[in-house]
């Protein structure tokens, strides 16, 4: 539990025994990109036992939500070239194609497409931000809610932002994807439905699929090239990309460069 205690102290300014079930779930969501399912389950069970017997934050019949690890998915996925992504979007329905373009342009996870908001509508979480963040990327400022409830800024090219705003819903709607609830503000594809559409189009047109997560690999690799080409050293570029993608760990950025 030492790692959980460090997280509680560093990110939440509380002790281990003060952590709530909701905060524990946020921690596990963040860890899901860093470790495999076995380790993630062991950490969840350790936190759960602590909450049952020590902090009493959970009743004996209550359980922490089981979080699926994305670590293997990140390791296995590979990037797509811009040309390959164009081929994929051309064979998708407009709603799915727009989501693919948005995910590629801003390095989004599939579920983050549900959470897109203009930046003036919602503030961002307090996290480190280097001055060179988004350097070389023009566009409109939006936010998404990512792993662990973290709200971060993303940059969307103006022509895509215009298409997105044309899909703004008259009223936000509640949607559920993979048992998680979201409030959606735009009529675009996201989550499981978008990922399935992406994989089908990739298999049909390219003869195989690296999965929708490959779009994030493409973003990471393109941004690393852009930043280094502008004179920024590799270590700093890794840190910038980690901030833009919402994991804030340069070593995780490395896994996207395979």
Pin down the residues of each PLM region:
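N-terminal core-binding DNA-recognition domain of tyrosine recombinases/integrases
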Residues: 1-76
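Basic, Lys/Arg- and aromatic-enriched nucleic-acid-binding interface segment
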Residues: 82-111
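The alpha-helix within a helix-turn-helix
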Residues: 103, 114, 242-243
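Conserved tyrosine-mediated DNA breakage-rejoining catalytic core shared by Y-recombinases
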Residues: 116-162
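Active-site/catalytic core of tyrosine-dependent DNA strand-transfer enzymes
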Residues: 155-221
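Short basic/aromatic active-site micro-motif
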Residues: 207-228, 234-243, 247
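Catalytic-site neighborhood detector that most strongly recognizes the C-terminal catalytic loop/helix
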Residues: 243-258
């Amino acid at each position: 539990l030492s790692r959980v205690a460090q997280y509680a102290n560093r990110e939440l300014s509380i002790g281990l025994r003060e952590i709530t079930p909701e905060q524990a779930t946020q921690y596990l969501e963040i860890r899901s990109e860093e470790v495999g399912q076995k380790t993630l389950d062991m950490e969840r069970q350790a936190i759960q036992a602590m909450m049952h017997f020590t902090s009493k934050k959970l009743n004996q019949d209550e359980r922490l939500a089981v979080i699926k690890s994305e670590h293997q998915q990140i390791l296995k996925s590979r990037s797509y070239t811009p040309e390959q992504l164009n081929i994929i979007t051309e064979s998708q329905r407009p709603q799915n194609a727009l989501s693919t373009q948005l995910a590629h342009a801003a390095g989004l996870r599939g579920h983050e497409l549900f959470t897109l908001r203009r930046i003036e509508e919602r503030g961002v979480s307090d996290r480190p931000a280097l001055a060179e963040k988004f350097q070389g990327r023009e566009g409109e400022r939006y936010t998404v809610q990512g792993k662990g409830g973290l709200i971060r800024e993303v940059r969307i090219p103006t022509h895509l932002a215009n298409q997105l705003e044309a899909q703004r819903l008259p009223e936000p709607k509640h949607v559920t994807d993979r048992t998680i609830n979201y409030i959606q503000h735009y009529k675009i594809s996201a989550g499981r439905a978008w990922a399935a559409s992406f994989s089908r189009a990739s298999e049909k047109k390219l003869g195989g699929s690296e999965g929708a997560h490959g779009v994030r690999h493409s973003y990471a690799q393109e941004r690393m090239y852009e930043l280094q080409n502008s004179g920024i050293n590799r270590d700093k570029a890794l840190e910038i990309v980690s901030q833009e993608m919402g994991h804030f760990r340069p070593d995780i950025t490395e896994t996207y460069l395979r």
